Amino acid sequence: PGITYSVDKASMYSTKFQLAQIMGVYSADMAYSVLNKQSNEGQMYLKTVREVGNKLNLSKVFDQGNLFDRFNANMENEDSIGTIVADIQYATDNQLAENQQNELYGVIFAGAWIESMYIAGEVYKKEGNENVVQALFEQMAVLNSIITELKAYETKDPGITPLIAQLNSLQAQFDALPSVKKLDENPDLDFSDVKPEKGEMDPLIKTIGDIRAAIVKG
């Protein structure tokens, strides 16, 4: 509670870039709510994702296969909800391609990834669970793929270049961590083999919070 982004702010965003980012943010909030058995919040976030998606000409996503109704009917079934969320993702990707809006895929993905990382960081700050830090550390492996996706469409929207710059800065900060350097020195190790030292991820968590603040500011 209090970590996810308020649905009341959804109407603040108007450009395609802003809407794509915030759709990603709300998608991550929806997933977090579902994982934490917060049914009402999950339904509220799905409704908001759909409303934002409609503004991006993605209304067909939720009409296909009764995704919206299926989600609401299966809130208590974790396996079913996982499948439905994956179906929503797949339908969104297909609709973006059909609409020739491929540049928005990376923007939505970046918004969702940053929000997920932000939530994990906030949970860690409150609870001090080192397993959360490990999960954050391992999820950083995804960042290069997001940056590559955004670069492929950089000329399509003026908002993409500053987002790439922020993510590149985060990547550089991560690469400078002692634990990451240990990975570089030992090619046989992967992310799950290395545990960051206590406090090592704190500056990174702050940077993630700063990027999230920039995203929700629009």
PLM region descriptions:
Residues 1-73:
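N-terminal Sec/ER secretory leader and immediately downstream segment
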Residues 30-37, 56, 95-99, 120-128, ...:
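Secondary-structure edge/capping motif, primarily at the C-terminal ends of alpha-helices
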Residues 77-160:
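Extended amphipathic alpha-helical interaction segments
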Residues 152-218:
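A cross-kingdom marker for long, charged
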